[in-house]
From Swiss-Prot:
It comes from Synechococcus sp. (strain CC9902). Transmembrane segments: none annotated. It catalyses: (3Z)-phycoerythrobilin + oxidized 2[4Fe-4S]-[ferredoxin] = 15,16-dihydrobiliverdin + reduced 2[4Fe-4S]-[ferredoxin] + 2 H(+). It comes from the Bacteria. HAMAP family: PebB. The keyword Oxidoreductase applies. Keywords: Oxidoreductase. It is an enzyme of class 1 (oxidoreductase). GO terms for molecular function: cobalt ion binding; phycoerythrobilin:ferredoxin oxidoreductase activity. NCBIfam families: PRK13249.1 (NF009722). This is Phycoerythrobilin:ferredoxin oxidoreductase. Its EC number is 1.3.7.3. Pfam families: Fe_bilin_red.
Amino acid sequence: MTTTRHSSTDSVNIPGWGWQPFLEDAVQALQPLNLEPYPVANDFLYKQDQTGSKAKPITVTTATWACKTDKFRQVRAACVYGGTAASVLNFVINPSARFDLPFFGGDLVTLPSGHLLALDLQPADKSDEAHTQQVWEKLIPIFERWRSKLPDGGPIPEEAQPFFSPGFLWTRLPLGDEGDQLINSVVRPAFNDYLSLYLELAEAAKPVGDDRRDHLLKGQRRYTDYRAEKDPARGMLTRFHGSDWTEKYIHTVLFDL
């Protein structure tokens, strides 16, 4: 199956892709805002290739949904589906540095080994109490509500810790009925709770002065530079679509600040 997407806000519909309901929830939650398409080159709006062996080829599809608003520099969803090889939704909201907001991050990954699922409101500067306190006071109760229902995903690397909040919800789930049930009954409502809080914080956010903007922008760049360098999807995307396409996608779409 092939499809054409002319704009980054055109709907994404990938047959068999398990994270479709999550993307639809997010797009629906954003509808009250004044959404404008975010500029994404045609080659990254929709890409299909073949992977696997000659005897058992696998069609892989990567699509990008993206928009911008007055307070969000970029909202983007990287959607990847390669049958049993991989199914991914990486949904990130990059706020404008004119507003004292964290990032929203949802990373939902299915691999042959299982599901790896992460949600967070990620700080631009974790050491800045003025930036984090109002967020964490509201985030931690939501985190506590859902983490008790999920197995812990394990430790995160020390070098990554500055980029995650104490409300980082991170789990690994098995393939099959047990994992699917937890995704539907726990992970999806948790995703929507995190996103609802983020949109509530954004609605209340007021513009900051130039010095504060510069401080936040510096922190945002630290985050995006780190993510671009360490993107765990690099190997998978390179295998699916080649190195040149992958590096351009990472640096000009996913982490383009």
